[in-house]
Amino acid sequence: MSLPHSLFLVIFGASGDLTRRKLMPALIKIHNGKRFPEHFAIIGCARTAYTDETYRAYLKEELIKFGFLTKEEMETLDDFLSTVHYQSMDPADETTYFLLNDRLKELSPQYENNGNYLFYLATPHLLYELIPKCLHDAGLLKKPGLKRIIVEKPFGYDLASAQKLNKIYAAYFKEEDIYRIDHFLGKETVQNIMVTRFGSTIYEPIWNRNYIDYVEITAVENMGIGTRGGYYDGAGVLRDMVQNHLMQLLAITAMEPPAKFDKNGFRNEVIKVYQSLRPLTDKYIRDNVIRGQYIAGDDRIGYREEKNVRPDSRTDTYVAMCLYVDNWRWQGVPFYIRTGKQMPTKVTEIVVHFKPAPMQMFQMKEGFYKGEELIIRIQPDEGILQRIAMKEPGAGFYMGTMEMDFSYDQHDQETGDAYVRLLEDSLVGDPTLFTRSDAVDESWTYFDKILDYWKKHPETPLYGYPAGTWGPKEADVLINRSHSEWTNPCKNLTHSNLYCKL
């Protein structure tokens, strides 16, 4: 795979928060690394009435004001912005796409572009159905030239809507040209899970039911919903986080080694994990899925006091559940996943708990030995920590634990932004780390059963938990069934902006 000679990156939603905070800072890094095509331009599209000059001035002010740039990026900012153009249009108005087509034709001679377009949908998801058809009807998908499209989550609201979207996109794009982006897969530590698993003779032989007791996957935030009340109250955290982000982390943790690490080999193994999940029955959902909603705690308001949230809302802001991957490698090993808003800290990590030795001849001075752990910290402070058994210094043979850790920050290694990696992959046409349509269908097929159960059984408990705590106590009961407890990086009601030690 290689860069095309020329390419236009067309961003819908160019005046929005995602473009300002994530896309433009990532694109500057790619520009400075000289990893753009030889002839490359960015065309921002939104309703705001900018010109090329005023849009560049807006971006420059925003990027400087919010401190997104390094010293080197500040020095090259004007050079980068010279590749940025703007077309005022309404993505919801199909007639304005002809204006975009005319603009791209106008710019094509300057950039030697023969119709190579990469479209990025940084828009509200309600426009996802409309935009592909409008692109087609305005002649923007005509040959010659490559045509690719990047779509942010959520890709669908449920199985039916996801299948409808897949059908719409398949009518206008090849599957290999549809890039359903999940920024978790662009994170260095997530990709490193596969290297640790399949490239290490220490972990590869023991990564199975014979040596692993249980696995935790946590992805929580210390903020509420902010200004997203209108969207979030109709979605909830199961749709917003579990169906996509946590499922990807589960798949990478549990997948078999692909026969070949390419766009199909990797994603085929992801699908196999989804298909191996223990089927959900009503009883299983009752016993193994906990949902919650944050209430006022300390100095934080409750969910129902948030802007644009119904005062009697039953929307989930916390979900914990126990899953099983029913295959040869993982039979009987519980995977505990949880995600929530208004937690004590922001952290995403995977904790692999290994089984204790079959006979313990050494005692702990205090407490009991829980077994060794491998902690994979995805954000913040990306790194890996291994807790292993070690003799306590002094007389006797008392057992304790020692921590061996690696942090990218401590070794001055730049992990890079997830959007940098994923944008680079889309530029060269590598969809390996993007979600395939069949994975979307499999994931929604699984979680639709939980959503349907909640809809049919409105009496299903929605447990309140004070903002700033680790969620409802019922989630602790869920994991305590395996004589276990959640791995919490810090205590309840920690309101510091500082991240917790790995």
Language model features by range: what are they?
Residues 1-151, 155-502:
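Secretory/organelle targeting and membrane-embedding segments
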